[in-house]
From Swiss-Prot:
<feature type="active site" description="For ring-opening step">
    <location>
        <position position="144"/>
    </location>
</feature>
<dbReference type="GO" id="GO:0004342">
    <property type="term" value="F:glucosamine-6-phosphate deaminase activity"/>
</dbReference>
<feature type="active site" description="Proton acceptor; for ring-opening step">
    <location>
        <position position="139"/>
    </location>
</feature>
<dbReference type="InterPro" id="IPR037171">
    <property type="entry name" value="NagB/RpiA_transferase-like"/>
</dbReference>
<protein>
    <recommendedName>
        <fullName>Glucosamine-6-phosphate deaminase</fullName>
        <ecNumber>3.5.99.6</ecNumber>
    </recommendedName>
</protein>
<dbReference type="InterPro" id="IPR006148">
    <property type="entry name" value="Glc/Gal-6P_isomerase"/>
</dbReference>
<dbReference type="GO" id="GO:0005975">
    <property type="term" value="P:carbohydrate metabolic process"/>
</dbReference>
<comment type="pathway">
    <text>Amino-sugar metabolism; N-acetylneuraminate degradation; D-fructose 6-phosphate from N-acetylneuraminate: step 5/5.</text>
</comment>
<keyword id="KW-0119">Carbohydrate metabolism</keyword>
<comment type="function">
    <text>Catalyzes the reversible isomerization-deamination of glucosamine 6-phosphate (GlcN6P) to form fructose 6-phosphate (Fru6P) and ammonium ion.</text>
</comment>
<feature type="active site" description="Proton acceptor; for enolization step">
    <location>
        <position position="67"/>
    </location>
</feature>
<dbReference type="GO" id="GO:0019262">
    <property type="term" value="P:N-acetylneuraminate catabolic process"/>
</dbReference>
<dbReference type="Pfam" id="PF01182">
    <property type="entry name" value="Glucosamine_iso"/>
</dbReference>
<dbReference type="GO" id="GO:0006046">
    <property type="term" value="P:N-acetylglucosamine catabolic process"/>
</dbReference>
<dbReference type="GO" id="GO:0006043">
    <property type="term" value="P:glucosamine catabolic process"/>
</dbReference>
<dbReference type="GO" id="GO:0005737">
    <property type="term" value="C:cytoplasm"/>
</dbReference>
<dbReference type="InterPro" id="IPR018321">
    <property type="entry name" value="Glucosamine6P_isomerase_CS"/>
</dbReference>
Length: 242
């Protein structure tokens, strides 16, 4: 694992967009593990620019999103289905919809949905590149502190800190979903390559804990020490202090 400070969030986002584009252009049936949230906005913005400029054929690219809120249907403006459509799939509308996979947080039977999604990843994966953000409490996906390191796709009860952090996207904190469907930690580790991004001073503490080089269930992202091919890119504000 290597933590690299690329100075600004813009440059780091552009770098990761280039890495995704390179993977897609070199292997036209690439499988990508995608993330959402504020950290990824510029990654997708730059990726769309690269795709448009080069008119890349993405009809065989397959994607698997990390998570989705429980209780929001795909059309809800704050669902991660809507996020991905607005940030990427509608901006470059040449992906094959049947190859774009996001957990169904509004499924009638959520336990069956977690099993279905895990089985789908096992059948079609592993993904070539999994991109990740990190929460202030060290969560990746929606795997909160204390998550079993062997967890598969599962239903998560979100912590108060995560609910509070996500409340900026909703009219008020009461409207923020309290649960999510998330890839598990063991699911994430199946990827061939993992790229994690962290921007801003609020993420520094989590990155410093990640830099301690040991697996700690209280900081879920530390499970990445068990993976042989992890890259972490930060800006100046999130860079660990010496």
């Amino acid at each position: 694992m290597k933590i690299t400070n690329l100075g600004t969030s813009g440059y780091a986002s552009f770098y990761v967009a280039c890495e995704l584009y390179k993977q897609m252009s070199q292997q036209n049936h690439s499988k990508l593990g995608l993330a959402t949230g504020g950290t990824m906005v510029d990654v997708y913005r730059f990726l769309v620019q690269l795709l448009r400029k080069n008119k890349l054929d993405v009809s065989e690219i397959e994607t698997f999103n990390l998570d989705e809120y429980v209780g929001l249907d795909a059309q809800h403006e704050q669902s991660y289905h809507s996020y991905m459509n607005e940030m990427l799939f509608k901006q470059y509308p040449y992906f094959n919809p049947s190859l774009l996979h996001i957990p169904n947080g509004d499924a009638d039977n959520l336990n069956d949905e977690t099993k279905r999604y895990e089985q789908l990843i096992n059948q079609k994966g592993p993904v070539d590149i999994q991109i990740l953000g990190i929460g202030e409490n060290g969560h990746i996906g929606f795997n909160e502190p204390g998550t079993d390191i062997n967890s598969a796709t599962h239903i998560v009860d979100l912590t108060e800190s995560t609910i509070s952090a996500n409340s900026r996207y909703f009219d008020n904190e009461v409207d923020v979903p309290k649960q999510a469907v998330s890839m598990g930690l063991s699911t994430i580790l199946k990827a061939h390559r993992i790229i994690l991004l962290a921007f801003g001073e609020k993420k520094r503490a989590a990155i410093e804990k990640l830099a301690e080089n040991e697996v700690n269930s209280d900081v879920p992202a530390t499970i990445l020490h068990a993976h042989p091919n992890v890259e972490i890119y930060v800006d100046d504000e999130a860079a660990p202090r010496l």
